[in-house]
A protein has these predicted regions:
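Carbohydrate-binding surface patches
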Residues: 200-204, 210-220
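Rossmann-like S-adenosyl-L-methionine
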Residues: 2-10, 18, 219-457
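Short beta-strand micro-motifs enriched in acidic
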Residues: 46-50, 134-138, 202-206, 456
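Short, conserved phosphate/pyrophosphate- and ester-handling motifs at nucleotide-, phospho-/glycolipid
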Residues: 40, 164, 287
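Terminal RNA-binding accessory module
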Residues: 1-72, 76, 361, 368
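Short, acidic/hydrophobic/Gly-rich beta-strand patch recurrent on exposed beta strands
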Residues: 22-27, 146-149, 213-215, 344
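Extended interfacial segments that mediate partner engagement and assembly in macromolecular machines
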Residues: 60-72, 78-186, 206, 221
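Short, solvent-exposed loop/turn elements at beta->coil junctions and helix N-caps
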Residues: 116-124, 189, 198, 202, ...
Length: 457
């Protein structure tokens, strides 16, 4: 019998889904997905939509709380939705992430590969080195920063996001005060009027340097010099202030035009000893300390020797490969984004002549480059794969297998696509040795995985 809208059921939450919702079953066996619940909760659930084989519900009341449930310490955690697991004890969060990775490799990959316990993040709050606050107005009409409520473009004001360092929240709030005092208008998506769309902040965890970037509909910002003086006087770690221009009617945050108001236009930091320069368009892991753990695992799995050639596909700014360059004979990196390749070359140069001499970076599609390198007879000893969420296409994996590396190390932000690609590699002569989940995103459902493969044929 179909579930009815607004019907209330008492259900026991069994597990978490991939998006962090609790999963329960109705008396008739229909799966019900309920955000904000924890495995072990017994709760009154109100049905909001029945889709036939499954339904969606909302939490009406907790009747018996899960032993893993903890108090939520953020007033806007519900409507904001950014911290989908903020109500869950961190040990339970790690267990859930480990179970999700294990399930993906067994169900999608068909593999009984050892999945190690997830590596916890060194920090579970205030860990992000980057934030992109949309700018809007609060209920009193004052400019505010916040985040979009789930599946909407309604801004939930959030003056103190628990995932951001205090200083980034403080800078965001100071900017809103400045906008209000000088009648600088937030952009309104409904009317396409206003100036400031986003406040984009970066912080170098090791350097302490901060980048402030205002995403605006035009390059001219009223009182820009006064703003620079006020910000740098109050926040001494601000190294650069920029305006990024995005006048399009789009959901894309950044435009292609950036102007520097103060400083060099970038900040500096290090990641696993690799010196990097970061601007608004730079791709960089948002949890620096956990990323260093992840890179350490990748290096351990690579088992490089001084005679090895390392091929780093989807290399980005080159940080993974360059962090291992001391341990191999030659490094080749491939990335499709031109700015990232220029950054990779500059990062190699900053590491000194010896690293620069053994490192080569090419701007190309990873699959096409891998196919060309395979056709040219390149035989890397180790291949590093760090694809986007969609994973590798078959042409890329086929080219990797043709090059016949001794080992393949696969870094992924999507356990499901990593498991799919693991199955392909297993079917083409590479055995999955082990999988290490690494928690780069505490309080959320996301989890990175590192897996390694050895040649068997």
């Amino acid at each position: 019998m179909p579930l009815q809208k607004n019907q209330v059921l008492t259900l026991t939450i069994e597990r978490l889904s991939n998006d962090g919702s609790g999963v329960a079953h109705s008396p008739d066996g229909e799966a019900v997905f309920i955000p904000g619940t924890a495995p072990g909760d017994v709760a009154a659930i109100r049905i909001v939509k029945d889709c036939g084989r499954y339904a969606f519900g909302i939490l009406d009341a907790i009747q018996t709380p899960s032993p893993d449930r903890i108090p939520v310490d953020c007033a806007v955690a519900g409507p904001c939705g950014g911290c989908s697991l903020r109500h869950l004890d961190y040990a339970a969060e790690l267990r859930a992430k480990g179970e999700s990775v294990t399930d993906a490799f067994r169900r999608i990959g068909g593999l009984d590969v050892p999945v190690l316990p997830p590596l916890p993040s060194p920090e579970i709050d205030r860990y992000r080195n980057k934030v992109q606050f949309p700018v809007g107005r609060d209920k009193n009409g004052k400019p505010c920063i916040g985040f979009y409520a789930g599946r909407t473009h309604r801004i939930v004001p959030c003056p103190d996001c628990k995932l951001q360092p205090d200083v980034l929240n403080e800078i965001g709030n100071t900017l809103c005060d400045f906008f209000a005092a000088h009648n600088i208008q937030p952009y309104d998506e409904q009317t396409s009027k206003g100036l400031v769309r986003h406040v984009f902040l970066r912080r170098g965890v090791h350097s302490g340097q901060i980048m402030v970037c205002l995403v605006c509909t035009r390059a001219k910002l009223p009182h820009a010099e006064e703003l620079c003086r006020a910000l740098t006087a109050q926040f001494s770690d601000i190294a650069t202030i920029l305006i990024n221009v995005n006048a399009r009617n789009t959901n894309v945050i950044l435009g292609s035009e950036t102007h520097t108001l103060y400083g060099p236009g970038f900040i500096e930091d290090t990641l696993c000893g690799v010196p990097v320069q970061l601007g608004p368009l730079s791709f960089y892991q948002v949890n620096t300390l956990a990323a260093e753990q992840l890179y350490g695992i990748a290096a351990e799995y690579a088992q490089l020797t001084p005679d090895d050639l390392l091929l780093d596909l989807y290399c980005g700014m080159g940080t993974i490969g360059l962090s291992m360059a001391d341990h191999c004979r030659e490094l080749i990196g491939v990335e499709i984004v031109p700015e990232a390749i220029e950054s990779a070359k500059a990062n190699a140069a900053r590491m000194g002549d010896a690293i620069a001499a053994k490192s080569r970076f090419f701007c190309a599609d990873a699959g096409k480059a891998a196919s060309q390198l395979a056709a040219e007879g390149l035989h890397p000893d180790v291949v590093m794969l760090d694809p986007p969420r969609k994973g590798c296409d078959e042409a890329t994996l086929s080219a990797v297998v043709t090059m016949s590396p001794r080992r393949v190390v696969y870094v992924s932000c999507s356990p499901s696509t990593a498991a799919r690609d693991a199955k392909w590699l297993e079917e083409h002569g590479y055995r999955a040795e082990k999988v290490q989940p690494v928690d780069l995103f505490p309080r959320t459902r996301h989890c990175e995985v590192v897996s390694c493969y050895t040649k068997t044929m």
